[in-house]
Each structure stands twice: as C-alpha cells, then as structure tokens.
C-alpha cells in the first residue's frame, strides 16, 4: 500500500506550521523504522499539481493547523466535491481529490488531520499547547502508518475531539 503524508502551512506563523512539523517528525520516525512505502511532502499550501502526487497513492493524509474548537486534533475523511471550480490561489484537499479523479481516474482514500493551534504571530516556533497537540497526533498516526489496512472508515477509528 502506497501512502502520502502531506503537511501544509506557514512555519513562519507559529502554529500555522503544525502540518509541516508533523511531516518532519513522521518522516524521521518512518526512516528509523524502515517504512519505505510512505512518501512525505510539505508546502505552504496545496496546489493543483498535488492531484498528480496523490494519483498513485492508496492513502493520503493531509495535515494542517486548525483554529477550530477541538481539543487537540481531529482526523476527517475528505470526499471529492463533485465539481471543479478554482477561484483562489490555494486548493483545498477536496479540490485536489476531485481533480485527481477527473484527470487520472483515481480516487485514493484522503484524510485531513486538523491539529489545534493557538498562536499565529510572525515567529518560527510552535506554541507549547500546539506542540502537545502535535505530539499526540504523531503518536495517533504511527499505528495507522505501520498498518494502513486498519479499517479507517469504521466508527471509532477517527479521533474526534
């Protein structure tokens, strides 16, 4: 099974860099554990080119910082929107998935990991509270990445706060 973990955000805006930091931590862990079926990417934002990057994967986990009212993190399944309209400079995970389906006739399982952030100033450091949330999210994802055959769509598999 081919996996992609893709973090996005701005590491120069404190907790907005949570997705990128998640990728850094998991990439080191995967290398130490010989997990060579996982690809890691990060960027400031998702782009239309990412539709190709996900087209040859079975499972894609996008990770981003969140201002949502959640405890620490939340993993949700992304469905294609059913329509293509590109009106901003950045693409959403649903848009990237829909574009992948349209252009490559592929539909990987796509999840979005929302990691709770608190500080958004122009600094290159993650706040202590967000760091705890990040550490919890990393530990939650490790067994999923080790055994992606886990029933990801079943109740109880997704972390909800």
Question: What are the residue ranges of the model-derived segments?
Answer:
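N-terminal catalytic or cofactor-binding beta/alpha core of small enzyme domains
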Residues: 1-115, 124-136, 141-149, 158-161
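A cross-taxon signal for low-complexity, glycine/charged-rich
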Residues: 153-155
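Acidic/polar active-site rim loop that often engages polyanionic ligands
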Residues: 118
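Glycine-rich phosphate/diphosphate-binding loops and the adjacent beta-loop-alpha structural elements
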Residues: 121
